[in-house]
């Protein structure tokens, strides 16, 4: 509790304990509310140290606000507590939680108007958000919007449900869009089990970091005034760099996209893990005699994602093996379509292959190819002399 008590100084704590939970109510904020908020933030994988400053509280509020409409009562209580704490840090006198929330809303409206005005002045409405989650605050500084609990929960749920099947990689890529190395480490740290897989991932990251250092040796001499130091492999992995340094590299001119570089290393490691969890080779994926073409394509692409190959090689695998390993019925149709056929055309053409409707059509075509003379002979011999005397 001692560490959490340091969130407020003595004078601030006095002000905190004078604020009522509800307008006209008797209950007031106590130290236990800060302790509870810290624990809740830890549960959401958010650094509780952010509660110690007004800027940190602002970041937490920005992170929680999108979830308020659909969030639980605990989430609303956490938002209210942080909003009140923000006002105490800012030395804004408030009697209760509602007044604190009104103040937050007022500041957010002002911020929105200034952002809209700035966008109108520059003629570029995307200027504020183009580097999200790194955004520009009212003072013109580039600040970081921490990864949201909703994103973290989605990531944890994917790993729990899918383990490390191939679809985990595109999901990780989507959820970590624009993330800093700190965000990426937060995502990795939320994975509770699968420690063997996480150790493999760590080894891959260390290998890539060492390779980065080999290809990007440190320049001799002092750093020029106003310039940032060059990131080392461990900086990119977020172990020896601060969040401010990461933001600086990512927003510098020209930028060094440490987040994207680290993300590539992680995806490389995830590919190795997926390969271990899904040992089936793409060469082994063949369409069963009665398997619908759609199901075969699903299995094919799921395994293809786990293949450790360049995109060019994967394209070749798709163009060659998808047709080559189809069952005879589908293969005949696909070869007739030609090599330029799209996947949509293939799936449309092979729809229903193997089913009773397809078999009936094949039988009808075979019957239509019977020569006319044979048909006539069969008709001439209609039931003649069938009854023996």
Curated annotation (Swiss-Prot):
Function of this protein?
Answer: p6-gag: Plays a role in budding of the assembled particle by interacting with the host class E VPS proteins TSG101 and PDCD6IP/AIP1.
Let me see what the UniProt entry remarks about domains: Late-budding domains (L domains) are short sequence motifs essential for viral particle budding. They recruit proteins of the host ESCRT machinery (Endosomal Sorting Complex Required for Transport) or ESCRT-associated proteins. p6-gag contains two L domains: a PTAP/PSAP motif, which interacts with the UEV domain of TSG101 and a LYPX(n)L motif which interacts with PDCD6IP/AIP1.
Q: Which organism is it from?
A: Human immunodeficiency virus type 1 group M subtype B (isolate WMJ22) (HIV-1)
Q: Where is this region: Interaction with host AP3D1?
A: 12-19
Task: Name the protein family.
Answer: Belongs to the primate lentivirus group gag polyprotein family.
User: Which PANTHER family does the record match to this protein?
Assistant: ENDOGENOUS RETROVIRUS GROUP K MEMBER 24 GAG POLYPROTEIN-RELATED
The region called PPIA/CYPA-binding loop is annotated at 217-225
- Region annotation (Interaction with Gp41) maps to 7-31
**Quaternary structure annotation from Swiss-Prot or TrEMBL:** Gag polyprotein: Homotrimer; further assembles as hexamers of trimers. Oligomerization possibly creates a central hole into which the cytoplasmic tail of the gp41 envelope protein may be inserted. Gag polyprotein: Interacts with host TRIM22; this interaction seems to disrupt proper trafficking of Gag polyprotein and may interfere with budding. Gag polyprotein: Interacts with host PDZD8. Matrix protein p17: Homotrimer; further assembles as hexamers of trimers. Matrix protein p17: Interacts with gp41 (via C-terminus).
Alphabetized Pfam families for the sequence: Gag_p17, Gag_p24, Gag_p24_C
Of the GO CC terms on this record, one is:
membrane
- Residue ranges for the region (Interaction with membrane phosphatidylinositol 4,5-bisphosphate) are 73-77
Motif Nuclear localization signal, residue numbers: 26-32
PTM annotation (Phosphoserine): residues: 148
> Where does the record place the region Dimerization/Multimerization of capsid protein p24?
277-363
Q: List site positions: Cleavage.
A: 132-133, 363-364, 377-378
Name of this protein:
Gag polyprotein
């Amino acid at each position: 509790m001692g560490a959490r008590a340091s969130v407020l100084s003595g004078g601030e704590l006095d002000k905190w304990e004078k604020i009522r939970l509800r307008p006209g109510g008797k209950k007031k904020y106590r130290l236990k509310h800060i302790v509870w908020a810290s624990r809740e933030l830890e549960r959401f994988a958010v650094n509780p140290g952010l509660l110690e400053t007004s800027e940190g509280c602002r970041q937490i509020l920005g992170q929680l606000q999108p979830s308020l409409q659909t969030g639980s009562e605990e989430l609303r209580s956490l938002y209210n507590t942080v909003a009140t704490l923000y006002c105490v840090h800012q030395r804004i006198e408030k009697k209760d939680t509602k007044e604190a929330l009104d103040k937050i809303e007022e500041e957010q409206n002002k911020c929105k108007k200034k952002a809209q005005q700035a966008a109108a002045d520059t003629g570029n409405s995307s200027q504020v958000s183009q580097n999200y989650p790194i955004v520009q605050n009212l003072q013109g500084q580039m600040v970081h919007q921490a990864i949201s609990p909703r994103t973290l929960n989605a990531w944890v749920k994917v790993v729990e449900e899918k383990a490390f099947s191939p679809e985990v990689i595109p999901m990780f890529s989507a959820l970590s869009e624009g993330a800093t190395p700190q965000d990426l480490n937060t995502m990795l740290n939320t994975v509770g089990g699968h420690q063997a897989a996480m150790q493999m991932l760590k080894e891959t990251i260390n290998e890539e970091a060492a390779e980065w250092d080999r290809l990007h040796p440190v320049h001799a001499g002092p750093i020029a005034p106003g310039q940032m130091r060059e990131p080392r492999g461990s900086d990119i992995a977020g172990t020896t760099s601060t969040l401010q340094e990461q933001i600086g590299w990512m927003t510098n001119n020209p930028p060094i996209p440490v987040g994207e570089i680290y993300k590539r290393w992680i995806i490389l490691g995830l590919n190795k893990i997926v390969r271990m969890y899904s040992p089936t080779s793409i060469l082994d994926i063949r369409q069963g005699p009665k398997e619908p073409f759609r199901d075969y394509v699903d299995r094919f692409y799921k395994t293809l994602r786990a293949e450790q190959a360049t995109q060019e090689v994967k394209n070749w695998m798709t163009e060659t093996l998808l047709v080559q390993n189809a069952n005879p019925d589908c293969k005949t149709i696909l070869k007739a379509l030609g090599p330029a056929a799209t996947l949509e055309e293939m799936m449309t053409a092979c729809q229903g292959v193997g089913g009773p409707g397809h078999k009936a059509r094949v039988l009808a075509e075979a019957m239509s190819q019977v020569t006319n003379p044979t048909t006539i002979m069969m008709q001439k011999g209609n039931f003649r002399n069938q009854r023996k005397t």
